[in-house]
Amino acid sequence: LHMLEDAGAECIVIPCNTAHYWFDDLQNVAKARMISILDATLGDIPPSARYVGLLATNATLATGLYQKKALARGLTLIQPEDAGQALVMQAIYTLKRGDKTAAQALLLPQIDSLIARGAQAIIMGCTEIPLIVAGHERAIACPMIDSTASLVRAAIRWYESWPDTRASLTGEQRLTA
């Protein structure tokens, strides 16, 4: 963290959901602005969605990171049941081995299960999950919230609001989120 700040970083993002277990501790000692993937993701939940599915690693679920912040926003999180969570993890590992088709066969039924249990939106709370879902978004009956994309949009908003950036960009040069 301090190496980034010493190199001139004025904003730091951590593109890993599970690593946000340490976010508050890091933020407490950081001089640079830090953007939370959790806050960015939850901020992208459609206002009409009160019941939100969560697909994430076992570690992210066990830490309760999303659960605590979602509850504070009045959201109810729906997680896969134990057998379904085992398949989510298997899908992640299968993708890492390079077999996207097999990973989709494992993960897509878990998405259907969350929707059947009332999910009005689903958080893809692991950076591999959007890679598995890619190409199937239109067939899914609710919004899929990509935590990495949410973090990127939040970082772009920070960048565009930074005084040095505002002064140097014209309207056409501004990034849109």
Q: What are the roles of these predicted feature ranges?
A:
Residues 1-177:
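Non-catalytic structural scaffold of enzyme domains
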